[in-house]
């Protein structure tokens, strides 16, 4: 899904003033950012570098001298969306530079769109800048000192993604991320903390920690300590928790040491929220995926986490219809869901991905069976969500305001990440609220995925 489709409306960080009508002689660039939050961070870094070099960011195709399309290539459906976005940019603008995960397959892109100016792979920032320089030469800008230390942001001003590493060391058979983005490469802890400090100083109220494998952070650099900060996820979470913003952890692989994070949640240093992709529950399915196969131990860990921090919210994603998945294996997943009682759940129907080892597995599941299992799984997840939210009616909770219009304030609880989880709506007494405000509400009503409340 495009993060700013298709009219190119990046939300600029606090303190930066960019007129869509560039000054005479000022080079202009547009950006379309597709895919996951990790790709969005790449887009922000590219735009920050370009602004520092004097480029203006165009809010539309017509005002841009060239357009960068940051693509997703994880699934065939994502590839199709990326090709469509490239085609639209070529049609509307004509001068297009392609980067991102699909850029790891340049022949695939140029085979469909031979007129693109350049193709670069994921997180190849210097190559993207070189391509921009060739297409739209830079011009010195005496106003670059107006660029805030936090850089250019494509998210609302009050929250920001904080990427702590690139790549992944796992070899899940359905995934090609290691082929596209390489092995785990952790950022130095002091650099992560300094970036977080700048974001908080610029007004960010919520830091969303992301990577491909957040719980493996620092393994590749042997948990090195530098300038008082150690590259280990527990230490990093503690450091970030001291900055005064909400800290939310995403993409946490279910290692045993994840337990060490839970006391930090109970203490209020980081949000009581874990995004852990379990993928399945049947041991045979997990082995075919090349994933950890101890589903019973996972249930024990979940119970332990809840004992330490009863308020913890658990989000996960699953794949149904994986090659070889039998009805009995799928039923095991449904039974596991009954026991696990996860708060937030996403589910995908398996699809082949070019280059994935799972493509060669026997006994692929028929499309109509995958659809049926997906519907049954989501019905189960929806019922669990509805019951859990209904239990919140009558409680008093803190929320962060995301948006305010004439009818309501759209907020999120500590249990809800932006874009992927639900909302809490305040439809009376919300006058004077602004995005980024953190307020207390009494929960009055619940639906399957959302809440309604009254400001205290």
Curated annotation (Swiss-Prot):
Q: What is its EC number?
A: 2.8.4.4
Q: Name one GO biological process term.
A: tRNA modification
| One Gene Ontology term, aspect cellular component | cytosol
Record family assignment: Belongs to the methylthiotransferase family. RimO subfamily.
MTTase N-terminal domain mapped to chain residues: 27-137
Recorded GO MF terms? 4 iron, 4 sulfur cluster binding; aspartic acid methylthiotransferase activity; metal ion binding; protein methylthiotransferase activity
Q: What does this protein do?
A: Catalyzes the methylthiolation of an aspartic acid residue of ribosomal protein uS12.
Which PROSITE patterns would you find in this protein's record?
Answer: MTTASE_N, RADICAL_SAM, TRAM
The residue ranges of the TRAM domain are 390-456
Report the Pfam families cross-referenced here: Radical_SAM (PF04055), TRAM_2 (PF18693), UPF0004 (PF00919)
Q: What does it catalyze?
A: L-aspartate(89)-[ribosomal protein uS12]-hydrogen + (sulfur carrier)-SH + AH2 + 2 S-adenosyl-L-methionine = 3-methylsulfanyl-L-aspartate(89)-[ribosomal protein uS12]-hydrogen + (sulfur carrier)-H + 5'-deoxyadenosine + L-methionine + A + S-adenosyl-L-homocysteine + 2 H(+)
> Could you tell me the keywords of this UniProt record?
4Fe-4S, Cytoplasm, Iron, Iron-sulfur, Metal-binding, S-adenosyl-L-methionine, Transferase
Cofactor(s) recorded in Swiss-Prot or TrEMBL: [4Fe-4S] cluster
Sites binding [4Fe-4S] cluster 2 sit at 168, 172, 175
Q: What protein name does the entry list?
A: Ribosomal protein uS12 methylthiotransferase RimO
Question: In this protein, which residues make up the domain named Radical SAM core?
Answer: 154-387
Protein residues bound to [4Fe-4S] cluster 1 = 36, 72, 101
State the encoding gene. rimO
Species source reads Dinoroseobacter shibae (strain DSM 16493 / NCIMB 14021 / DFL 12)
